[in-house]
Design a protein with these regions (language model features):
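Non-catalytic accessory segments of hydrolases
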Residues: 2, 14-189, 210, 368, ...
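Bulky hydrophobic/aromatic "packing anchor" residues in well-ordered structure
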Residues: 67, 77, 291, 521-523
Length: 688
């Protein structure tokens, strides 16, 4: 059962803090060298922070460290005001989450506006050696829900990597915009920008290296992490936003359909908010004055859609496009504050705003399956039974409209569009029952909303040659805590009608397969309850191995950001994603390299005619479709068998793992002998 992380009560948590916490009085004695105490001298201020130490694993935790002033009163909707470390600080308990609807009782609002805090998990205290690389994590939740308290950082600390998790304003309080300079929107993103500045200033006091900071996020957090790296706002020194040296985007990028809202959405949402709160919608100044005088509970949208009445609303929910969210602010005209999102992300990538910042991004293999087989299964099975050609005519039309949000990166091809809707409809027509139809809906929505945006992102990110990009597919469905624990209330992670879906499986019908949205999180973070305690549960040998490999992948990415030679080109892989090979990392019980990520499906979504005309795609879909004649020749790259991969992080400080079992070799895509059977894997995890 998912623990309710959101029932945080500051007073109760403070009462439960260890007695050793220092709150004031006479200066304490100098602590022991391994005590969880940090002394700071910065910006003309002195501070002493006391945290917690885990004696078993040897890492240090500092919770609830405020990086900005509470955004209340006239500061509501405005950009954050920095808070500097000063005085005696108790860092032994979490802040409350930012205001949001309670996922278990949507009519109830939880949290507090004084929520702009971060947590730090450090493997060691500062010393003479080089500081540890830093992973700055942004939680998901479709820009309207989430908290840092669920994400324990102990696994990354065992790879000599610091984890920082930051809270930021959500929903209307974080992304409301009138289009005027006093409420231009994206306050939640600017919160994260301020938290990143805090990390640059202070992380060295916690044993971190500010020149090796990876911004990582999941879902909408992955989109936010990508937007941070594409931002021109606040660039200084080496010209990288907020010291961003690398981006790890999990199941969400700046090209995801829900990454930024459509042009008219913020204005429409502002009017809806005015109507709902009883405030005047015009002029904008009166609306702002009215909203700033209201309790935050009146502003947070507690209405959650429970009954799906049409396909459009279904797609809005699972694509993360409903409600308030990030927006394009427009270019800087020197009449207001500089924007963080100045243009469409696709334009930023074309203009190489990412500069030399490397990107690691990926997806789970069944992103939408839990939503399709759970919360929305009845709606979808009813549609499959009652609407002729539902997948082809209704669903696919809606998905193609959503994918247009990727914007300008779909290759333009002459001639008729490829038979994209026919492909998924043919899969359904060749199936036996409606549950198989759900499988095709899960495949189609997963391709459109996650796989294709990730694929387009890695292509565009590295197109200019300055930045490297890497793609992974997380395909292990283990027994660790599922995504609903980390993402309560998010439709993609919602267990929904799990009992009903399980009954369908018992009846001999197919069910969801593969990890769904958020299921990879327990393989990076220790799932924690509201008091910061591990949820526990059995961890199999395979679960432990996959967790070690996935944590190792992220840690190695951070460790190879090149602090000494001042470059951000990592030597993590000898084979980044490229136009020729399209290599990607496949994470299952073991880790392998593969080529041609969903090669034919990406060809259909990208309207790449010459790809579909090739022999490989004819083998994949030829039995389903009578493909039109295409005259463009194509050479299909061949996936050779790959050698075994060594342990991901065998020689990093603090690693306590054993080498993984032998890896099953990857099957060739064709029987044609490749020209070069060696893919140079010696450098893939060199020195790990």
């Amino acid at each position: 059962m998912c623990v309710k992380l959101w029932m945080l009560v500051g007073a109760a948590l403070a009462a439960s803090a260890p007695a050793a916490a220092v709150m004031g009085g006479a200066p304490a004695d100098v602590p022991q060298s391994d005590a969880a105490v940090v002394f700071v001298q910065k910006h003309g201020r002195s501070a002493r922070l006391e945290g917690l130490k885990d004696d078993r694993l040897g890492y240090y935790s500092f919770f609830g460290v405020r990086y900005a002033e509470p955004p209340v009163g006239p500061r509501r909707f405005q950009r954050p005001v920095r808070r500097y470390l000063s005085g005696e600080l108790n860092a032994t308990y979490y802040c409350q989450p930012c205001p949001q609807a309670d996922p278990w009782n949507p009519q109830r609002i939880i949290g507090n506006e004084d929520c702009l805090c971060l947590n730090i998990y450090a493997p060691k205290m500062p010393g003479d050696e080089q500081g540890s690389p830093v992973v700055f994590f942004i939680h998901g939740g479709n820009y309207k829900s989430g908290s840092t308290s669920a994400y324990g950082g102990q696994h990354l600390t065992q790879k000599d990597t610091i984890l920082v998790t930051a809270q930021y304003r959500l929903g209307s309080l974080g992304y409301f915009s009138t289009g005027e300079k006093d409420a231009s929107g994206n306050a939640g993103l600017f919160d994260l920008r301020t938290a990143m500045t805090w990390v640059n200033d202070y992380i060295s006091f916690f044993g971190g290296d500010p020149s090796r900071v990876v911004v990582m996020g999941q879902g909408s957090g992955g989109a936010a992490a990508s937007l941070m790296a594409l931002s021109t706002e606040g660039r200084s020194g080496e010209g990288r936003s907020g010291g961003v040296r690398g981006v790890a985007a999990l199941s969400g990028t700046a090209l995801s359909p829900g990454a930024v809202r459509a042009a008219g959405d913020p204005a429409d949402y502002a009017k809806q908010l005015a109507d709902r709160t009883g405030c005047p919608d015009k002029p904008p100044e009166r609306l702002l004055i009215c909203l700033r005088q209201l309790p935050f509970e009146k502003i947070v949208d507690s209405k959650m859609t429970t009954d799906m009445v049409d396909t459009k609303k279904f797609l809005q929910e699972i694509s993360g496009r409903s409600g308030a969210g990030a927006r394009v602010e427009g270019t800087y005209d020197e009449r207001a504050l500089p924007p963080l999102v100045a243009e469409q992300p696709s334009d930023s990538m074309k203009n190489q705003q990412q500069q030399e910042v490397p990107l690691l991004t990926g997806v789970t293999s069944a992103e939408t399956s839990r939503a399709v087989f759970g919360k929305y299964s009845k709606f979808l099975t009813d549609k499959l039974a009652s609407v002729k050609d539902f997948i082809k005519e209704d669903l696919m039309g809606g998905l193609q409209g959503v994918v247009s949000a990727v914007g300008g990166l779909v290759p333009a091809r002459a001639g008729a569009a490829l038979p994209l809707p026919d492909y998924y409809q043919a899969l359904f027509d060749n199936s036996l029952n409606a549950v198989d139809g759900l499988s095709q809906i899960a495949e189609a929505t997963g391709d459109a909303l996650f796989n294709f945006p990730a694929y387009q992102t890695v292509k565009a990110w590295s197109a200019g040659g300055a930045a490297s990009s890497y793609l992974y597919s997380f395909e292990y469905a283990g027994n660790l805590t599922k995504g609903a624990h980390f993402l309560p209330g998010v439709p993609l992670a919602d267990n929904g009608n799990a009992t009903e879906a399980a009954g369908s499986e018992r009846a001999g019908r197919a069910g969801p397969s593969g990890p769904a949205h958020g299921d990879e999180l327990a393989y990076l973070f220790e799932p924690l309850d509201a008091r910061g305690q591990p949820l526990g549960g059995e961890v199999s040998a395979a679960d432990a191995r996959v967790r070690d490999n996935f944590v190792g992948l992220i840690a190695k990415f951070a460790h190879n950001l090149g602090a000494k030679d001042n470059t951000t080109k990592p030597n993590l892989f000898n084979l980044p994603f490229s136009k020729e090979g399209e290599q990607f990392i496949k994470i299952n019980e073991d880790v392998t390299l593969d080529k041609n990520f969903r090669f034919c499906q990406m060809g259909l979504w990208g309207n790449i005619g010459e790809r579909i005309s090739g022999a490989l795609c004819k083998d994949v879909i030829g039995s389903l479709l009578n493909l039109p004649k295409m005259t463009l020749p194509v050479t299909i790259p061949v996936t050779p068998k790959l050698p075994l991969l060594p342990n991901l992080l065998g020689d990093l400080r603090g690693s306590k793992t054993t080498p993984p079992r032998q890896v099953v070799q990857v099957t060739r895509a064709t029987t044609k002998k490749p020209k070069n059977s060696a893919l140079g894997l010696g450098g893939l995890f060199n020195g790990l």
